[in-house]
C-alpha cells in the first residue's frame, strides 16, 4: 500500500536522524533569511525604474525573484523536516544528467535570447530559469557521489582528475558551448576542483599546480596590463572584457561605460551612502543594474559601511557552512556542504571583484 510505503520511508529517515544526530544551525538560518530579505529589497530598489520603463510594472523583477524565493524556502522546509540528505546519493546521477539535458533546451523555442546570449528558458506559469544553475547542483551531487564511490582510491591523483573531468570539466564545457556563459562554466569547474581538493589527502601536487598557475597568471597579467595601457583592443571578446575592466576610462564611450558608471556609483556613496532607494546611477546609467552590477548600487545607497556589513554576513554564512562540512556525520554530507560552500564563495567573490 502507498501509505505503508510512505510510513516505512519516514521511519527510515527518523532512524537515520537518530543514528547520525540531527543538528540545525540557527545562526546559518538567521543569516540566510537576512541576506535573502536584503537581496529582495535591493532587487526592488535597483530594478523598479528599469522594470517600469521596460515592462510597465515596477515590481516585475522583484515579483519574479520573490516567487523563486518562496519555492526555495518551501523546498528547504521539506528537506529539513521530511527528507534526509542521503537520498541525494541515489539521485546524484539523475540530477547530473537532468541538468545537462536542460542545457539543450536553450537550443529549442524555449530558449530566451537577451543581449546576444541565450542563457534562460521559459517555464510556463513561473517565468524563466537558467539551466546552468541546475548543472551546478548536479555537479555538487555528482562530485560528492563519485568521491564516496572512489573510497580509498581518492588517494590517487588520477582518480581526482577523472572525477573532475566527469563531474566538473565536462559539464563546464557543455555550459560554455551551449550558452557562451564563461562565468557559470568556470564556477561549475571550480566547484569540482574545490571538492576534490578537500577530499584528496595529498597536498604537494596542488602546491605545484598552484605555483604553475601563479606563474602563468603573472605572465598573463603582465601582458594584459601592457595591452590595457596601450588602449588596443583584441579580436577576442573575453580578452576585451578584461582590458576594459583594467582600464575602463580608455573605453568610456563604448565597452567601458558600464564599469565607469559602476565606479561612479561606488564613489558617490561615500561612507554611509545616499539612502535606500536614492541611487541616481540605477536610473538608466548602469545597464542591467539589478544583475551583475547590483553591488555598485548597494555601495551608492548604503555606502561602504553597508557594503562591508553585507560582505561580513556572507563571511558568517560561509563560516557556518564550513563548520557543517567539518562536522558532518559522513563523507557524503561533508562533500555536499563543501560543494555548497564553493557554490556560494566563488560567485560572491567574482561579483564583488567585478564591481
Which ranges hold each PLM region?
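Helix-boundary and loop/linker segments of multi-pass membrane transporters
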Residues: 21, 286, 328-329
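N-terminal membrane topogenic signal
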Residues: 18-31
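Short, Lys/Arg-rich, polar N-terminal cytosolic tail immediately upstream
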Residues: 1-19
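Long extracytoplasmic/lumenal interhelical loops at the membrane interface
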Residues: 263-305
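Re-entrant/interfacial helical elements at transmembrane boundaries that shape
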Residues: 278-282, 313, 354
Amino acid at each position: 500500500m502507498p501509505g505503508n510505503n510512505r510510513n516505512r520511508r519516514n521511519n527510515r529517515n527518523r532512524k537515520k536522524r537518530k543514528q547520525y544526530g540531527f543538528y540545525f544551525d540557527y545562526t546559518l538560518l538567521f543569516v540566510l533569511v537576512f541576506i535573502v530579505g536584503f537581496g529582495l529589497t535591493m532587487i526592488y530598489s535597483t530594478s523598479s525604474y528599469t522594470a517600469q520603463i521596460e515592462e510597465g510594472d515596477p515590481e516585475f523583477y522583484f515579483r519574479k525573484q520573490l516567487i523563486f524565493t518562496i519555492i526555495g524556502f518551501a523546498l528547504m522546509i521539506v528537506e529539513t523536516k521530511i527528507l534526509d540528505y542521503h537520498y541525494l546519493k541515489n539521485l546524484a546521477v539523475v540530477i547530473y544528467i537532468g541538468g545537462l539535458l536542460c542545457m539543450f533546451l536553450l537550443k529549442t523555442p524555449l530558449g530566451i535570447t537577451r543581449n546576444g546570449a541565450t542563457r534562460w528558458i521559459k517555464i510556463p506559469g513561473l517565468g524563466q530559469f537558467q539551466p546552468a544553475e541546475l548543472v551546478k547542483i548536479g555537479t555538487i551531487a555528482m562530485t560528492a557521489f563519485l568521491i564516496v564511490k572512489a573510497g580509498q582510491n581518492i588517494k590517487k591523483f588520477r582518480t581526482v582528475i577523472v572525477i573532475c573531468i566527469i563531474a566538473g570539466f565536462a559539464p563546464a564545457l557543455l555550459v560554455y558551448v551551449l550558452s557562451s556563459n564563461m562565468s557559470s562554466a568556470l564556477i561549475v569547474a571550480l566547484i569540482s576542483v574545490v571538492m576534490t581538493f578537500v577530499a584528496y589527502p595529498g597536498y604537494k601536487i596542488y602546491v605545484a599546480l598552484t605555483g604553475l598557475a601563479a606563474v602563468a597568471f603573472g605572465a598573463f597579467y603582465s601582458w594584459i596590463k601592457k595591452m590595457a595601457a596601450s588602449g588596443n583592443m583584441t579580436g577576442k571578446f573575453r580578452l576585451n572584457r578584461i582590458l576594459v575592466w583594467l582600464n575602463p576610462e580608455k573605453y568610456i564611450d563604448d565597452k567601458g561605460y558600464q564599469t565607469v558608471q559602476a565606479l561612479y556609483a561606488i564613489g558617490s556613496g561615500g561612507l554611509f551612502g545616499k539612502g535606500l532607494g536614492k541611487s541616481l546611477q540605477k536610473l538608466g546609467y548602469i545597464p542591467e543594474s539589478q544583475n551583475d552590477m547590483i553591488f555598485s548600487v548597494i555601495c551608492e545607497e548604503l555606502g561602504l559601511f553597508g557594503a562591508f556589513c553585507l560582505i561580513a554576513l556572507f563571511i558568517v554564512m560561509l563560516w557556518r557552512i564550513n563548520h557543517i562540512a567539518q562536522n558532518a556525520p559522513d563523507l557524503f554530507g561533508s562533500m555536499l556542504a563543501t560543494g555548497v560552500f564553493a557554490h556560494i564563495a566563488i560567485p560572491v567573490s567574482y561579483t564583488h571583484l567585478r564591481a
